[in-house]
């Protein structure tokens, strides 16, 4: 294996390492799983058709749903969609997916972080969170109803917020977590603020 070089054997060992770690976790030989980055181009194959760890773990544990949850000391960001082309994001933003992710984040904040009543911010999909329907309909037709439904399920969530102003004004500091609609919307500010200290929880 040559560090920094894509090789078939490197990709093969990355998959085998992850597979063995999952097996050990299922058999209760270990209590937790910590992963290192994998190079998607080097591991994707018929054997591993996943876009990253999160969908692989969902399949491996036959989970109904999972959430990509990025955590640092000063900020926590979860995603509704993960590794998708931007052109496909809107079609994957559904009321059901938003509610499901909110429930998962809420559960994690309570169980894993010991927060009794977590406050979760929800970002809009479109610029300025749609400007009340002037720039896209997703906020009015999907995101707001999802927030309302999540609240009825005892999830203390608010939004949708315009992502640029939300992070620029430090509003994220008032919440225990943020739910972003897509990868770059959430991870660009997260990585900028976490400065190398964040992990995919």
What are these regions (language model features)?
Residues 1-138, 143-201:
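Anion-binding alpha/beta catalytic cores of soluble intermediary-metabolism enzymes, centered on
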């Amino acid at each position: 294996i040559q560090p920094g070089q894509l090789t078939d054997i490197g990709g093969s060992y990355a998959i085998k390492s992850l597979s063995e770690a999952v097996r050990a976790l299922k058999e209760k030989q270990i209590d937790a799983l910590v992963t290192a980055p994998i190079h998607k181009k080097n591991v994707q194959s018929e054997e591993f058709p996943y876009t990253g760890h999160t969908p692989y773990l969902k399949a491996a544990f036959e989970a109904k749903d999972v959430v990509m949850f990025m955590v640092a000391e000063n900020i926590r960001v979860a995603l509704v969609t993960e590794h998708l082309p931007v052109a496909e994001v809107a079609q994957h933003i559904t009321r059901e997916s938003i509610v499901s992710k909110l429930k998962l984040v809420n559960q994690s904040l309570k169980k894993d972080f010991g927060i009794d009543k977590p406050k979760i911010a929800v970002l809009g999909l479109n610029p300025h969170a749609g400007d009340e329907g002037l720039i896209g309909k997703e906020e009015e037709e999907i995101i707001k109803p999802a927030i309302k439904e999540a609240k009825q399920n005892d999830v203390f969530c608010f939004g949708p917020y315009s992502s640029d102003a939300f992070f620029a004004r430090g509003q994220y500091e008032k919440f225990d977590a943020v739910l972003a609609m897509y990868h770059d919307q959430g991870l660009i500010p997260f990585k900028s603020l976490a400065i190398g200290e964040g992990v995919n929880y």
